[in-house]
Amino acid sequence: MPWDTRPGRSANGGPEGPGAARLRVQKQCRKSSFAFYLAVRDQLPVWLLEDIRASEAFHCDERGRAAAYSPSEALLYALVHDHQAYAHYLLATFPRCALAPPSAGFRCCTAPGPHVALAVRYNRVGILRRILRTVQDFPVEERVRLLDRRGCSRVEGGGTSLHVACELARPECLFLLLGHGASPGLRDGSGFTPLELLLRQLNQDASSAPTKAEAASATVNAATANTTSSEEVCQRRLLLLDLLVLYTPGGVVGPARCELLGDQLRWQRLLGEDKFQWLAGLAPPSLFVRAMQVLVTTISPGRFPEALDELPLPSFLQPLDLTGKG
């Protein structure tokens, strides 16, 4: 929508006061912001979106003044609506600006840019892959800061993007993050690593497993409602666990290990004997796991995930679509 630059008038016909002028600007900002949001949602062409962003779309900054959308804020919209062409353009044209922290109205704290975590939350595999490729050209400190960003403690529990991937069962996102150097050993606000968080969720899933009758009813409901069954979620969590094992040199320690040892038979049934023995610190990883751990570490982030095609991957990794086109 064109921005109305004409001065307003008061009720008695005189010039409007500063309060009325501020309200008028805020109203126009809301209208133009919503128009830009809808334009991205409707997947309009990149050239048109950039024209709107440059000349027509404004939002209110923290002082209540009209401000143009930055590439960072535009990328947030592209992520929400999976506009891959627009996201790729912003990352290619404004790599640092697109991944910079947005203005205060688009975030809840002073943490680095939320784009990686948002891509995981919305399962935007294609855009996440482009983001990770973009940050490979950044200095090491800047790249690590973006990959290992800790979310807001109030809203995101102080977790990293790996925690988000485990929480929401996003194996494709997790594999991309690990392959590009995200740290699996960082703890969230509750003190859990991604691996420990995942074990906690698997434990909760197993504790709330339905009876056979409930499972049959859930199968019928899932077929009619197109929902994800609890069994499918559990399988995705086990796949997440297999992926984390490839990038985790040791098992779990502290309370998590005590939990594994406290109900060994249950965990052995859930994880399998070999995986349980290693995670609980009772035995070294199997030769297969150790070989895969060495193999994946030979792939540089710059060649990930393309170099996976050259490796004899195990069957559990082959169905993963890391292109975002599926």
Curated annotation (Swiss-Prot):
GO terms for biological process: intracellular copper ion homeostasis; proteasome-mediated ubiquitin-dependent protein catabolic process; protein ubiquitination. This is Ankyrin repeat domain-containing protein 9. Residues 1-20 are annotated as: Disordered. One of its GO terms (molecular function) is ubiquitin-like ligase-substrate adaptor activity. InterPro entries: Ankyrin_rpt, Ankyrin_rpt-contain_sf, E3_Ligase-Neurotoxin. It is found in: Cytoplasmic vesicle; Cytoplasm, Cytosol. Its main location: cytoplasm. It comes from Mus musculus (Mouse). Substrate receptor subunit of a cullin-RING superfamily E3 ligase complex (CUL5-based E3 ubiquitin ligase complex) which mediates the ubiquitination and subsequent proteasomal degradation of target proteins. Depending of the metabolic state of the cell, promotes the proteasomal degradation of IMPDH2, the rate-limiting enzyme in GTP biosynthesis or protects IMPDH2 by stabilizing IMPDH2 filaments assembly. Implicated in different cellular processes, like copper homeostasis and cell proliferation. GO terms for cellular component: Cul5-RING ubiquitin ligase complex; cytoplasmic vesicle; cytosol. Gene3D superfamilies: Ankyrin repeat-containing domain (1.25.40.20). It comes from the Eukaryota. A motif (Important role in both nutrient sensing and binding/regulation of IMPDH2) lies at residues 108-109. Pathway: Protein modification; protein ubiquitination. The keyword Amino-acid biosynthesis does not apply. ANK repeats lie at residues 70-99, 111-140, 157-186. Keywords: ANK repeat, Cytoplasm, Cytoplasmic vesicle, Hydrolase, Repeat, Ubl conjugation pathway. Part of an E3 ubiquitin-protein ligase complex with Elongin BC (ELOB and ELOC), CUL5 and ANKRD9. Interacts with IMPDH2; leading to ubiquitination of IMPDH2 and its subsequent proteasomal degradation.
